[in-house]
């Protein structure tokens, strides 16, 4: 516990010996003082009372002591009273410093002491190690000038806490109540700096609760009173606080004092003061944003950038998979080790990142919803012979479904929500549009194509103008906890798995023949049709063929996998048109897009291909394109206009060769 010692020849024996000693005049703790305190993690502090110079103070000595008492690392606070005891600098060293025996003496570069006002070099001449800290033009005298000249914004930037007045609320004539503006009045100490008389934007702290308000400082000329005081009108406040101590923080000067000719003039002026204060607070309030953190570097950089932009950032993490609850028995992590996306590790990384950035973290569990709305749909597509895309479903039903609904319920419908997707949103005529980003390799609009416009309301994509190398560099420069973490791969929210083992938990897997369609002969055995994708050429485990082979068809009725030679890909794998089912339009002018040159992508990172919409009916769209290899049913076709705004997308159901 901090001990406070009024330093005299008798009490000096109570001072701890051999610790650092910070010496200074601490009337209002500012950033220059903070530099002094950072020089040691264990120190005593020596300050002075009753400075001989006739100068007004920022705060009473009791407030100075209260502020200093909160310092980390401070062991003893020594107060030396200069009244009738102002020794020369050398006498002070001989009578006090030599008895204190400090390890080091820490002072500011402008420090002078003693009746002869000698600088800090005298300590060194007496054999003490002196640490001199430059305060960069941050001084109490400069802060006083700023406050007197009504530049409270700059003064508060230099102070560690906003400039304030304190006092006990007094009884008065209660004339404010008669005109609808109740005030809490405190008497101002005449020893403190004399503020410019007038109206100020303020905050009032009552019983450790903070309220917005306005205050008048001066001798109220309106009613011919002479006592200098602070009259604070607290917004939306009707408690009886007479006799209570309050703190009034000053933020902005509104207008000088004037004499009003009538009550109505006074009321109008106060109303205008209140409007000015409310406008000030509205501009000062940090907009709140929830960042969806995944444990990866992209979302971490989102949180960091939004903090740097002045947002009030909170974080949310959602768990969508539980290995035990979901009966995942057979699947080991890929390569027999945890890599990339692992729910437990990701949550731990997210917690450590939030501790580093000092932001609050909320945890949401959507294991049941993920199973029903995403995973069962994935299994259903596999059973139909399709190649599903879990990432599209994750965004459609998960991140921008149950997740944002839960966040809006928690924080309000207008809460801004940020994601680490490489995507861009443009608002035009109060409508939001999804747009391709500058990083063509990383762009993730493909995975967002099934989102409705209402799902994109108040969504922020902070990485929209950045590429991946830049994001990595930002993370490293900011020393973010996950800066060197690998990108996640594998199944959305499930992570790296031995895919064959994993899928075997939920689907009946049966081996069968691999038929080379060019020669109509069996060349091997597949491990189960679900494990293969149209156009796949790797991991077929078939050797001895004269050419590279590709998966070209899957016959679920006969459990047969068909492959073809590379030279016959055009015959078996090419297409010039396809049908997109449950097409989600993100641009309303679809009639104007009919038979117009557009762009399409059938898989993430694929180079954009020319196309045109040849017909649409209900939720089905037929699209024609330049010849493509490996367009796969179950995946999605995403269409862009000439400006790379997303027109919409749908699931590929039919291929037209």
Curated annotation (Swiss-Prot):
One of its GO terms (biological process) is FAD biosynthetic process. Pfam families: FAD_syn, Flavokinase, tRNA_Me_trans, tRNA_Me_trans_C, tRNA_Me_trans_M. InterPro entries: FAD_synthase, MnmA-like, MnmA-like_C, MnmA-like_central, MnmA-like_central_sf, Riboflavin_kinase_bac, Riboflavin_kinase_bac/euk, Riboflavin_kinase_dom_sf. Residues 389-391 are annotated as: Interaction with target base in tRNA. Residues 283-657 are annotated as: tRNA-specific 2-thiouridylase MnmA. One of its GO terms (molecular function) is riboflavin kinase activity. Residues 1-141 are annotated as: FMN adenylyltransferase. Pathway: Cofactor biosynthesis; FAD biosynthesis; FAD from FMN: step 1/1; Cofactor biosynthesis; FMN biosynthesis; FMN from riboflavin (ATP route): step 1/1. GO terms for cellular component: cytoplasm. It is found in: Cytoplasm. Disulfide bonds join 394-492. Keywords: ATP-binding, Cytoplasm, Disulfide bond, FAD, Flavoprotein, FMN, Kinase, Multifunctional enzyme, Nucleotide-binding, Nucleotidyltransferase, RNA-binding, Transferase, tRNA processing, tRNA-binding. The active site is at 394 (nucleophile), 492 (cysteine persulfide intermediate). Residues 442-444 are annotated as: Interaction with tRNA. The record marks 421, 635 as: Interaction with tRNA. Involved in FAD and FMN biosynthesis. In the N-terminal section; belongs to the RibF family. This is Trifunctional protein RibF/MnmA. It comes from Mycoplasmoides gallisepticum (strain R(low / passage 15 / clone 2)) (Mycoplasma gallisepticum). The lineage of its organism: Bacteria, Bacillati, Mycoplasmatota, Mycoplasmoidales, Mycoplasmoidaceae. The gene is ribF/mnmA.
């Amino acid at each position: 516990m901090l001990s406070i010692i009024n330093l005299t020849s008798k009490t000096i024996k109570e001072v701890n010996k051999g610790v650092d000693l910070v010496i200074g005049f601490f009337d209002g703790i500012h950033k220059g003082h903070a530099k002094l305190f950072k020089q040691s993690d264990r120190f005593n502090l020596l300050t002075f009372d009753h400075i001989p110079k006739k100068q007004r103070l920022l705060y009473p000595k009791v407030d100075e002591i209260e502020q200093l008492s909160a310092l980390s690392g401070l062991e003893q606070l020594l107060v030396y009273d200069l009244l009738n005891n102002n020794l020369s600098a050398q006498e002070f060293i001989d009578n006090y410093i030599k008895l204190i025996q400090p390890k080091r003496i820490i002072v500011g570069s402008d420090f002078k002491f003693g009746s002869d006002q000698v600088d800090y070099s005298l300590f060194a001449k007496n054999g003490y190690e002196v640490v001199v800290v430059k305060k960069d033009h941050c001084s109490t005298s400069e802060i006083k000038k700023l406050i007197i000249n009504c530049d409270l914004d700059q003064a508060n930037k230099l102070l560690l806490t906003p400039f304030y007045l304190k006092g006990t609320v007094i009884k008065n004539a209660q004339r404010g109540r008669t005109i609808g503006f109740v005030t809490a009045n405190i008497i101002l100490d005449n020893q403190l700096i004399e503020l410019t008389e007038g109206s100020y934007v303020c905050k009032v702290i009552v019983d450790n609760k903070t309220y917005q308000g306005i205050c008048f400082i001066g001798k109220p000329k309106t009613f011919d009173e002479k006592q200098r005081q602070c009259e604070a009108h607290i917004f939306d406040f009707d408690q009886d606080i007479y006799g209570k101590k309050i703190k009034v923080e000053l933020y902005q000067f509104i207008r000088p004092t004037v004499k009003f000719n009538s009550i109505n003039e006074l009321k109008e002026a106060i109303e205008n003061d209140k409007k000015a204060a409310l406008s000030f607070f509205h501009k000062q309030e940090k907009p709140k944003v929830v960042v969806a953190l995944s444990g990866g570097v992209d979302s971490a950089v989102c949180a960091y950038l939004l903090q740097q932009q002045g947002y009030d950032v909170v974080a949310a993490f959602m768990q969508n998979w539980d290995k035990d609850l979901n009966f995942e028995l057979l699947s080991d992590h890929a390569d027999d080790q945890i890599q990339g996306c692992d729910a437990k590790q990701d949550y731990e990384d997210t917690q450590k990142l939030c501790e580093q950035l000092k932001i609050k973290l909320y945890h949401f569990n959507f294991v049941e919803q993920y199973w029903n709305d995403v995973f069962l749909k994935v299994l259903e597509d596999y059973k139909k012979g399709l190649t599903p895309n879990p990432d599209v479903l994750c965004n459609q039903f998960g991140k921008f479904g149950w997740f944002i609904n839960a966040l809006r319920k928690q924080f309000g419908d207008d809460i801004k929500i940020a994601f680490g997707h490489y995507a861009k949103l443009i608002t035009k005529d109060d409508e939001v549009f999804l747009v391709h980003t500058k990083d063509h390799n990383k762009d993730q609009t493909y995975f967002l194509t099934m989102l409705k416009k209402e799902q994109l309301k108040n969504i922020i994509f902070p990485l929209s103008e950045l590429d991946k190398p830049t994001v990595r560099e930002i993370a490293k420069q900011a020393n973010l906890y996950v800066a060197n973490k690998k990108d996640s791969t594998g199944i959305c929210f499930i992570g790296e798995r031995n895919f064959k083992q994993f899928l075997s938990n939920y689907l009946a897997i049966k081996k069968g023949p691999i038929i080379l369609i060019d020669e109509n002969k069996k060349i091997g055995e597949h491990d189960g049709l679900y494990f293969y994708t149209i156009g796949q050429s790797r991991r077929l485990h078939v050797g001895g063929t004269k050419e590279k082979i590709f998966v070209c068809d899957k016959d679920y009725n006969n459990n047969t996998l068909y492959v073809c030679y590379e030279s016959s890909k055009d015959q078996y794998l090419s297409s010039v048109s396809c049908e997109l089912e449950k097409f989600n339009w993100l641009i309303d002018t679809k009639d104007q897009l009919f038979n117009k040159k557009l762009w399409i992508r059938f898989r993430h990172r694929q180079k954009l291909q020319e196309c045109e919409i040849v017909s649409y009916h209900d939720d089905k769209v037929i699209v024609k394109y330049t010849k493509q290899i490996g367009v796969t049913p179950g995946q999605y076709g995403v269409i862009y206009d000439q400006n790379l705004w997303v027109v919409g997308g749908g699931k590929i159901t039919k291929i037209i060769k």
